[in-house]
C-alpha cells in the first residue's frame, strides 16, 4: 500500500528552517532517521520510506507554498495513491508552538498551501498534520513571523516535537487516522 506524505514549505536557502517550512523539517527528520536521501523530480524532491509493507512517498514540493496542489495531484496520479492515503504536514499559526493536531479533513484556515491543494483536488477531505508555530507577532506582522526562524525557546523542544510528528506520520500509515488521532491529539 502506498501513501503520499507531503511536507509544505518554500524552496530556497532563505526559507530553510523557517516556521513556514516546518513541513520540510519534519520530512527531513523522517528521511534522515532511515538514511534516505531526497531526489529532485517533477514538482518536488521525493524519498521513499518502506515501513512494514507500506511505501511512504515523502514529498517536498518545489512549487512554492501557494501552488502545492500541483505537486500533490501529480504525485497522487503518478503513484496511484488514493486520497485517503494522503497526509499533508503544515504549519499552523492558530496552535501554540509544538502542538500537533491530526485531522481527517477541514478548512484551509487561511493557509495558502492548503487552499491550493483543496482547489486542485476539488475537496478539503484530505488528512493534514498541523504543527503549531504559535502567533507571537504584532498586528500586520504575520508574513515576517511565518518566514522567520524559531526562537531559542522553541528550539529547546523542537527535536522532540519533530520526532513526535514523525511518529504520528508512521502511525497514520500503520494504524489509520482514527486510532492515530485518538492516541496523539490529546497530548
Swiss-Prot record:
Pfam families: Pept_tRNA_hydro. CDD domains: PTH. Its EC number is 3.1.1.29. One of its GO terms (cellular component) is cytoplasm. InterPro entries: Pept_tRNA_hydro, Pept_tRNA_hydro_CS, Pept_tRNA_hydro_sf. The active site is at 20 (proton acceptor). It comes from the Bacteria. One of its GO terms (biological process) is protein quality control for misfolded or incompletely synthesized proteins. TRNA binds at residues 15, 64, 66, 112. GO terms for molecular function: peptidyl-tRNA hydrolase activity; tRNA binding. The record marks 91 as: Stabilizes the basic form of H active site to accept a proton. It catalyses: an N-acyl-L-alpha-aminoacyl-tRNA + H2O = an N-acyl-L-amino acid + a tRNA + H(+). The record marks 10 as: Discriminates between blocked and unblocked aminoacyl-tRNA. It is an enzyme of class 3 (hydrolase). Keywords: Cytoplasm, Hydrolase, RNA-binding, tRNA-binding. Belongs to the PTH family. Hydrolyzes ribosome-free peptidyl-tRNAs (with 1 or more amino acids incorporated), which drop off the ribosome during protein synthesis, or as a result of ribosome stalling. Catalyzes the release of premature peptidyl moieties from peptidyl-tRNA molecules trapped in stalled 50S ribosomal subunits, and thus maintains levels of free tRNAs and 50S ribosomes. PANTHER family: PEPTIDYL-TRNA HYDROLASE. This is Peptidyl-tRNA hydrolase.
Amino acid at each position: 500500500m502506498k501513501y503520499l506524505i507531503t511536507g509544505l514549505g518554500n524552496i530556497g536557502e532563505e526559507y530553510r528552517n523557517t516556521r513556514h517550512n516546518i513541513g520540510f523539517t519534519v520530512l527531513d527528520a523522517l528521511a534522515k532517521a532511515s538514511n534516505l536521501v531526497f531526489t529532485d523530480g517533477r514538482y518536488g524532491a521525493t524519498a521513499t520510506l518502506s515501513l512494514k509493507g507500506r511505501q511512504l512517498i515523502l514529498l517536498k514540493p518545489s512549487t512554492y507554498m501557494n501552488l502545492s496542489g500541483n505537486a500533490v495531484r501529480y504525485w497522487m496520479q503518478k503513484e496511484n495513491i488514493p486520497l485517503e492515503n494522503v497526509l499533508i504536514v503544515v504549519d499552523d499559526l492558530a496552535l501554540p508552538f509544538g502542538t500537533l493536531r491530526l485531522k481527517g479533513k477541514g478548512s484551509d484556515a487561511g493557509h495558502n498551501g492548503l487552499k491550493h491543494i483543496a482547489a486542485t483536488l476539488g475537496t478539503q477531505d484530505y488528512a493534514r498534520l498541523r504543527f503549531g508555530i504559535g502567533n507571537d507577532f504584532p498586528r500586520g506582522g504575520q508574513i515576517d513571523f511565518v518566514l522567520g526562524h524559531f526562537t531559542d525557546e522553541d528550539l529547546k523542544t523542537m527535536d522532540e516535537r519533530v520526532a513526535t510528528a514523525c511518529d504520528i506520520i508512521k502511525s497514520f500509515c500503520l494504524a489509520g487516522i482514527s486510532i492515530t488521532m485518538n492516541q496523539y491529539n490529546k497530548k
